[in-house]
Regions:
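Short amphipathic alpha-helix that is part of the acyltransferase structural core
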Residues: 4-48, 65, 163-165, 172-191
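Conserved hydrophobic beta-strand within the GNAT/NAT acetyltransferase core sheet
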Residues: 118-124
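Conserved acetyl-CoA-binding loop-helix of GNAT-fold acetyltransferases
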Residues: 91, 97-112, 123
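Conserved beta-strand in the GNAT
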Residues: 63, 69-78, 82-90
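Cysteine-cluster motifs in flexible loop/terminal segments that predominantly coordinate metals
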Residues: 149-163
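A short helix-loop-beta-strand connector motif used in the catalytic cores of GNAT acetyltransferases and
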Residues: 53-67, 159-162
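Short, high-confidence coil segments that cap the C-terminus of an alpha-helix
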Residues: 59, 117-118
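Conserved active-site alpha-helix within GNAT-family acetyltransferase domains
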Residues: 125-151
Length: 191
């Protein structure tokens, strides 16, 4: 499996390049984010998001910037029974096949792993090979909690979902310490 990028190990000059390329979205990015979402939502490949919704949730977006232009987007939605969803993943078609989506999913995994309340990343996707190469496993949609499906009410494919559910466990990436409790049982403590 591919390694996640540790920006602390990059030289200072490379950190600047990396942070410019793949970074937390800013409010100024909202229109560019919506433009990519609109492109993919026109044919039902992504759920439409209003500009207002994007602006209200801008802190949950990451963008891939190339030459000052937002060419890739991804959104993480936290809050379901230790699950985090990778959603609104899209790359400007002019920049397809350059590894941008791969880097964005790796970054999303890394961002999700920083939240100790999350054990699993999941996605509903058409891009099965992309997620498989990054270690995601196909799962039955029925295993996802019902509240996950709230966003699907506005989907063109509601009631006949043709996306594949996939998941990725964050637990192997957690740093833990093993201690003995009062019963001399080993207990894992996240660090």
């Amino acid at each position: 499996m591919s390694q996640l990028v540790d920006t602390k190990k990059l030289s200072p000059s490379n950190q600047v390049i990396f942070n410019i390329m793949l970074r937390k979205a800013k409010i100024e990015d909202a229109q560019a984010i919506q433009n990519l979402i609109c492109f993919y939502s026109e044919d039902g490949k992504m759920l439409f998001r209003s500009l207002e919704d994007i602006e209200q949730n801008i802190e949950d977006f990451r963008v891939y910037e190339k030459s000052g232009e937002v060419v890739g987007i991804v959104n993480l939605k936290f809050g379901w029974d230790k699950l985090v969803e990778v959603r609104s993943l899209g790359v400007d078609p002019r920049f397809h096949r350059q590894g941008i989506a791969t880097e964005m999913v790796r970054d999303a995994i890394e961002q999700a792993s920083l939240n100790l309340d999350c054990d699993t990343v999941f996605v509903l996707t058409y891009a099965i090979p992309l997620f498989e190469k990054l270690g995601f496993q196909i799962i039955d949609k029925i295993n996802l909690p019902q509240k996950v499906w709230n966003d699907c009410q506005q989907c063109l494919h509601q009631g006949n979902c043709d996306e594949t559910a996939m998941s990725f466990s964050l637990l192997p990436f957690r740093k833990v310490s093993v201690i003995n409790d009062n019963n001399n049982d080993e207990v894992l403590i996240p660090q």
